[in-house]
């Protein structure tokens, strides 16, 4: 039995979702940082539980041809670039696989094509926003990034994936904080003044916002600090203060103050101008966000008479991008400043058919339903926790033709798609987009279409209404699906089962009238699944 500090030779067979190597030894699964599939290593055991363990690389015996040898390991240790040791083409393949695996394991979906992940031409130095902790390290005020799975600061000046100008602003602010002897936050003692520095920079405009996150309102000589940093970076148009006096991991507190200039920066997205406030959500990779949103727009196949609901609308980036091409846009966002920004952004771009409210997405959806607003397309871009069940049910009740789902967490997206399918929607397209190169995170766009008589034949059998002989089994669709999965590990749809039943001469009761249109889009059962269904029908003595 392996124990702590044992050294053993292992081969890495897989990667976890977070990018750790996976090795199997003596019936245990070990997770190893900075190890890639096909690599053989000497592994030191760090920790062992009943079924899993953790190890670290003592020595590489065989290295992967896909290893990026040039990566500074500080970016791995901090988690800034937890996939940076893997070549970029392989990162994209890894992310495509993550999306496919989640859809299959969580939603049971294997028959919808997942397109290859859209990558970035230059996959470094892309982030338009930095959130940098300020701490004392060896007696000196430092800025940097926390070591992975800890709150121990690693001093850094080059963050690898951030806009280089943002890195320069952070270093300049660090030096000024030292010069003016402003005390960094001490998490253990709950003391000190400066907790975090947040810097935004417009990808197209170049405008810069600086946010000082402090534990109390008064900042000694703050006017002089601002004067000095603006001398170095005249592109700074906004200096904000956020006051966070709570014992929390949250970056921002509730109180905001404008110390210099305006309380927003302006940048462009898909041809529109957007004002971006300090607390507002705005995608951190502008170049790839435009591809992400354009994909969602293309998937939705918008028409002039479409009515759009833009849930989790942020500052209106996607809703305002489509407003000029549709009849109406209704957006909902929980952050008041973001709603105010979206309303200003609509005016800024002379858009009059976009309407925004401050509320939870599920509450707004229910209110709009009561008001008789009938959307044809719903756009959702929720946080990592995904959609609530009440929102999904309310959105399905609208009868919207199409739902374009933008997700930053494929696991919760797969969970939500599963419920949408139960409520009469079908997954049609999936496109991963790499908004976060060098990390394990991936954004995904999925298109759901409502099943209707114009495009699909949906059949349902009511066995109790059929005249079955004593030899026939009353196997339900669910039982047939379960049998096929247990024996063949294949997922088969109700439609496929119905097709094979019809082929075998089993009479079906149609749930809907068949469409009279010539061009019906009806998926056809594959030969492999047909044989599995036939086996099930024989098992249940239905043929």
From Swiss-Prot:
Pfam families: TRAM, tRNA_U5-meth_tr. The active site is at residue 408. One of its GO terms (biological process) is rRNA base methylation. GO terms for molecular function: rRNA (uridine-C5-)-methyltransferase activity. Keywords: Methyltransferase, S-adenosyl-L-methionine, Transferase. The keyword Oxidoreductase does not apply. Its EC number is 2.1.1.-. S-adenosyl-L-methionine binds at residues 283, 312, 333, 381. Residues 1-59 form the TRAM domain. Belongs to the class I-like SAM-binding methyltransferase superfamily. RNA M5U methyltransferase family. This is Uncharacterized RNA methyltransferase SP_1029. It comes from Streptococcus pneumoniae serotype 4 (strain ATCC BAA-334 / TIGR4). The lineage of its organism: Bacteria, Bacillati, Bacillota, Bacilli, Lactobacillales.
């Amino acid at each position: 039995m392996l124990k702590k500090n044992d050294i053993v030779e292992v081969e890495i067979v897989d990667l976890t979702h977070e990018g750790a190597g996976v090795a199997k030894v003596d019936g245990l699964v070990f997770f190893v940082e900075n190890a890639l599939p096909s690599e053989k290593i000497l592994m030191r055991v760090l920790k062992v539980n009943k079924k899993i363990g953790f190890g670290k690389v003592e020595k590489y015996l065989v290295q992967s041809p896909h290893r990026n040898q040039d990566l500074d390991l500080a970016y791995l240790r901090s988690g800034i670039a937890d996939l940076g040791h893997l070549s970029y083409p392989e990162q994209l393949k890894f992310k495509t696989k993550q999306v496919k695996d989640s859809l299959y394991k969580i939603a049971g979906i294997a028959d919808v094509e997942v397109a290859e992940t859209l990558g970035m031409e230059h996959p470094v130095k892309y982030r338009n926003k930095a959130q940098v902790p300020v701490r004392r390290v060896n007696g000196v005020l430092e800025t940097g990034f926390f070591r992975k799975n800890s709150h121990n600061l690693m001093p850094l000046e080059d963050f690898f994936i951030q806009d280089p100008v943002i890195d320069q602003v952070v270093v300049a602010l660090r030096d000024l904080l030292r010069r003016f002897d402003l005390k960094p936050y001490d998490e253990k003692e709950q003391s000190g003044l400066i907790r975090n520095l947040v810097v935004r920079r417009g990808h197209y405009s170049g405008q810069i916002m600086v946010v000082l996150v402090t534990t109390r309102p008064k900042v000694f000589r703050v006017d002089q600090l601002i004067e000095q940093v603006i001398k170095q970076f005249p592109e700074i148009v906004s200096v904000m203060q956020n006051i966070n006096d709570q014992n929390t991991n949250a970056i921002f507190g509730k109180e905001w103050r404008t110390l210099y200039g305006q309380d927003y920066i302006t940048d462009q997205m898909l041809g529109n101008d957007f004002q971006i406030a300090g607390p507002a959500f705005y995608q951190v990779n502008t170049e790839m966000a435009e591809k992400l949103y354009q994909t969602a727009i293309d998937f939705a196949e918008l028409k002039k008479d479409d009515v759009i609901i833009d849930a989790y609308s942020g500052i209106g980036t996607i809703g305002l991008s489509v407003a000029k091409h549709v009849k109406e846009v209704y957006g909902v966002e929980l952050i008041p400043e973001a709603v105010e920004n979206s309303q200003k952004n609509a005016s800024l771009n002379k858009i009059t058919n976009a309407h925004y409210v401050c509320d939870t997405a599920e509450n707004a959806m229910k209110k709009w339903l009561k008001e008789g607003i009938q959307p044809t397309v719903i756009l959702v871009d929720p946080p990592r926790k995904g959609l609530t069940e009440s929102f999904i049910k309310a959105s399905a009740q609208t009868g919207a033709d199409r739902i374009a789902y933008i997700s930053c967490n494929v696991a919760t997206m797969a969970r939500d798609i599963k419920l949408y399918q139960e409520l009469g929607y079908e997954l049609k397209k999936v496109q991963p987009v790499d908004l976060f190169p060098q990390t394990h995170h991936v954004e995904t766009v999925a298109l759901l279409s409502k099943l209707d008589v114009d495009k699909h034949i949906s059949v349902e059998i009511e066995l109790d209404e059929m005249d079955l002989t004593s030899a026939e089994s009353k196997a339900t669709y669910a039982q047939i699906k379960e049998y096929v999965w247990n024996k063949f590990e294949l997922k088969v749809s109700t439609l496929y089962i119905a097709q094979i039943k019809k082929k075998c001469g089993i009479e079906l009761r149609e749930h809907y009238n068949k469409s009279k249109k010539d061009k019906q889009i009806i998926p056809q059962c594959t030969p492999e699944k047909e044989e599995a269904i036939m086996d099930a029908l024989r098992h249940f003595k239905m043929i």
